[in-house]
Structures are given as C-alpha cells and as structure tokens.
Amino acid sequence: MIEPKAKPRARTNRIGRHLPTSGGLKKTLRLAREQGLETVQLFVSNPQAWAVPAPRPDAEAFVKGAPEIELNPVVAHAKYLINLASPSPEHRERSVYALAVELVAASSLGAHFVVVHSGSHVGSGEEGGAERLVKGLIRARRLAAAENGAAELAEPLIENSVGAGTQLCSTFDILAEVAEKAGVRVCVDTAHAHVAGYDLSTPEGARKVAGRLGTTLGDRLALLHLNDARNGLKSHRDGHERIGEGCISEEAWPELFVRLPGVPAVMETPYVTPEVDAEQVRLVKELAGGLPLAP
C-alpha cells in the first residue's frame, strides 16, 4: 500500500465509495459510517436489467440517515444498459425512459446526482451520436421532472468513456460540448481518462490533466470517480484497481486534489473487506490533504 508523501493541508474534497445495497439501505448507511465515508454512490436498481426500480421500504430511513452521518452528495449510478446515443430508435427510447425513471427513483432516496455513461454511436458517426445524447439527456430530465412534480430532482451527470470502439466522450472537449448543450454537469473517471490518453502516470502529467479539466470543464465538473487504472495509457481498455495498485502514479493523486478543490470523489475500486476498504478511504483522505475536512 502506498503512503502519502504530500505535506498536510486543509482538505476540501469529500471522499467516498460505491457501496452495495443488497443487504438493505440501513446496512449501506452502517458501512458508510464504519468506513468513514463523506459521500456515497449506489445503484437504485439492477444495472444489468431494464426492470423498473421497485419501491424501497427502507427509503425513508436512508433519506433521514444519510444527512445524520453527513453523507453529501449522495450519488446514484444509472443502468449500464442505457445508451442515449444509440442509432436504434427503440433502444434510444428505452434508454430515455430508463434514465427518467432512475432520476425519480434516486430522488426518492435524497440523491443529488445520477451518473450516466455517455454511450456509443454504434458506427453511425460521432456527431450524430453526440446530438442524440444531448437530446436524450434533455428529454429524460423533462420526463423525470414531470413525474417528480415539485419535489427536488436528482441531477444527471454524464461520464467520460475510455474511448473503446464507438464510445463517445472520451475527450474532455467532447464531454464539455455535450454537457453545455444538454445543460448538465459531468463526472470524470480517472481510470477512464488515463486509458483514453490523459497521462496520469506522473505528477507532471497529473498537473497537466487537472489544468485541462479546469479549462475545458470548469464548474461543470461535479464529481470524480476516483479509480486507479488496470490498463496503460491510451489502451482504451476499462478496468479499475484500488488506489496505489494500478498504472496511475501515487504522486498523481495529491496533484489532482490540490488543483480540483471541493470536487467530491467516489471510489469504484474492488472490494476486499470492510476493514481494508476503510483503510483505503483513510489513505485517500490523506492523499487529498488530511483527515479532517476544512471548515
């Protein structure tokens, strides 16, 4: 395991991880508390199936309990099946509806964000795929807002891809363009960025990447998916490793944190045990500047 070398400073990034909900949302809250999470991500339904999220009997307890242990933001991850950029009208419509339903379901749990993959143009061309993605995001939000009424609606965040095949939004420029046109913000996955061509294998590279994020995305950057990369630079192959066990330099993390102040970070790294996972959270907090959050 890596040890932080950065000089302690006031930490502004809230640190969390993706947690399972299979044992119930009360268990999710317990794990979050035991691991010292300050933000959390979860699925509101089976990410590999089109089934509509079922009402959660423990939703009220979660909505009450998350603020009590200062989980902020609460993040949901949308289904992997969603492809708003698909050239297939049937798949696209199903994706729009699925995202709308998940926005409403996430809102019922008090979630602030729903991360959705940017999808693929499936060989129909990047320009057309990006246009469909923008329209799909706008339509899904409108459908969800109509269903949710006056209640506060979770905000969709579009995520960068690894750039494999016909995937969209592997570059920050395209990600920013889509986000601006759709009126949404973004989630940047560090592992995706590295394998897509943004070099995080050195601290110098991390400084440049953070600079690019600042100039292209600015305030639209709402969340980091903090994952080490299983595969190398420009490999365009997805795969997450625990922090310090992949291809991203151990000295890159402090460079990102100091240049992206206030951006919450959620790990989607492999589970080991609750105790080992808690130690990983502690490590990342130190890499981000120190254990206590700045007031």
Task: For each feature predicted by the language model, list its residue ranges.
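Hydrophobic faces of well-ordered beta-strands that scaffold small-molecule active sites
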Residues: 13-19, 38-42, 74-78, 114-116, ...
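Short, electropositive alpha-helical surface patch
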Residues: 90-103, 126-139, 172-177, 207-211, ...
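Active-site acidic/histidine proton-transfer and metal-coordination neighborhood
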Residues: 68, 84-188
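Acidic (Asp/Glu)-rich catalytic clusters
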Residues: 8-9, 30-37, 54-75, 100-110, ...
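Active-site beta-loop-alpha junctions enriched in small/polar residues
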Residues: 18-22, 45-47, 78-81, 119-121, ...
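Acidic/histidine-rich catalytic cores of soluble enzymes
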Residues: 40, 139-241
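Flexible, acidic glycine-rich loops studded with aromatic residues
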Residues: 261, 269-277
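N-terminal pre-domain/capping segments
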Residues: 1-78, 82, 86-101, 290-295
